[in-house]
Amino acid sequence: MKKARKITATLLALAMMTGVMATASGCQSGPAASSAAPVASQEAANSEAPAAEGKTLNIWCWNDEFQSRFNDYYPEVKEVASDKSTTTLNDGTVVKWTINPNDNNNYQNKLDQALLSQESAAADDKIDIFLVEADYALKYVDSEYTLDVKKDIGLTDSDLSNQYQYTQDIVTDKNGALKGTTWQATPGLFAYRRSIAKAVLGTDDPAKVQESLSDWDKFNSVAAQASAKGYKMLSGYDDSYRTFSNNVSAPWVTDTTATVDANLMNWVKQTKEYAQKGYNNKTSLWDDKWQADQGPSGKVLGFFYSTWGINFTLLGNSLKTPVAEGGKEEVGNGVYGDYAVCQGPQSYYWGGTWICGAKGSDNIGTIKNVMKSLTSDSTIMKKITTDTQDYTNNKEAMEEIANSDFKSAFLGGQNHIKLFAEVAPKIDMSNAGPYDQGMNESMQKCFKDYFDGTVDLEKAKANFEKTVKEKYPEITEIKWPS
C-alpha cells in the first residue's frame, strides 16, 4: 500500500479543537474532509490486550447496515432490544451500539475523540469494534488504534482465503499488517431501466445493452440517442464519477504534491458536455431530484451503482409506495422489476464497510468470532446474499450463486451475482490512499459550479486548489494534466 498521510501535531490539534478540518470557501458546501487520525500514545501502542473477555461489546458505526447484518446473521445473537440499542449474545455479553451519522464528518470526529480516550476509558466503555469506509480506511489502518487481524485477533490465512484480494489490500497497513475485514465486496455495474433501453436501443437484454455501452465512445453515442427520444442518459453530475476516479494512474497525493489525474478531467469534459447538451438532469448525488429520477416518474436510462446501491438504494427509490408506507417490494409497485444491470464502459468499485478491532479491547475472542462468522463463513455469507441481494466477500459462495438458477425479481429475473462475480476480481486498489474521500468530495463540489455555468473552467480549478490547501495545509502544490 502507498505510504500513509503525514499528520503534523498542529493539524491534529486543530482537528481535535474544532471537530472538523478547515472549511474552504468558494465551493465547500458538503461534509468536511476526513480529519486526521488520532495518534496513539506509546503506552497504548505497547499495551497488551487483557486476557479475560469482557461482558460488554461496544460497536461504533454510522448507520444501521452492519447492525442489521449482525443481528440477523451472527449465530451467537440471543435477543435484540426493542429499541435496537443493545444486542444480547448467548454467553450473556451485551453489545452496545453507538451510531453517529456521517453528516459533516460527525462519525469520524466522534470516533477520533473516543479513540484518543481509549486508554483511560473504563473497560466497559472502551470501543471494541468500529466500522470504516473505503475512502478513509487508511487513516485508521495506519494508526495504532486498529488491531492486526491475524497477529492480534487470531484469524488465519485459511480463514481469509476466500475473500477478494482488493478487500484486504485496502485495509493493509504500510507494514503489511491486515487491520480489518469485511462481509461485502462492492464491484460496480451500470443499472438501467429495461423499458427505456427498449425505447432507445430496441432491446433490454443485458448482453446486447452491454455491447452498446462497452466503452465511453459508445456510451456517449447512446446518450445522444437517448436524448433524441426524450430521455436522459444520466441523472446528474456525479453519477459517472466513481467509474473515472477508480481508473486513475496514480494516488491523489505524493509527498506534498496533489496531482489531478487526466481521467478525472475526462469526467469533467464529459459531464460538462452532458450538461450543455441536456444528456443529464443536472442533479447531484443523493438529492431529492436524483432519487426521484430512479422512480416511476424518472426518464433516466441508468445509474452507476455498486452492490449495496442496487439493493439498498435503487430498489427503495424504484417503489411508488415505500415499504414504510405499506408498499411491497414487488412487480407493480413503481418500476420494481424494470431494472437490469450490465458491466458498462469500465470496471470500478464504490464503497464498502470494514470491521476493525480496536486497540485496548477486552473482547478479542468475541471480535475474532464476529469477524470469522460474518466475513469468512461461506454458508452465512451465501445466505446474506440470497436474502438481501448484497454481494458478499466470499468467492466460493458467490461463484456458487453465480452458477445457480438464482434470480432477482427486482432486476426482472436477472442473476446479477454472475456479473458481479466477473467484475470483482478486476478491482485494483493500488492507487487508493488516505486522501481519497476529501479530494474526491472537493473535486465534485468545486466543479459543480462549472457544470451549472456559474464559473468558468479556470475558476473551478482555482476554487479546487484553494479548497484542497485549506483542507490539507501539508499540500503545497497541485498539478493539472497538460
Located regions from the model:
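Hydrophobic core
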Residues: 12, 16-20
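Conserved N-terminal structural module of periplasmic/extracytoplasmic solute-binding proteins
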Residues: 9, 22-138, 382-385, 455-482
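Hinge/lid segment of periplasmic solute-binding proteins
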Residues: 40-46, 108, 119, 130-189, ...
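Short helix-initiation/N-cap motifs at beta->coil->alpha
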Residues: 100-113, 214-218, 282-296
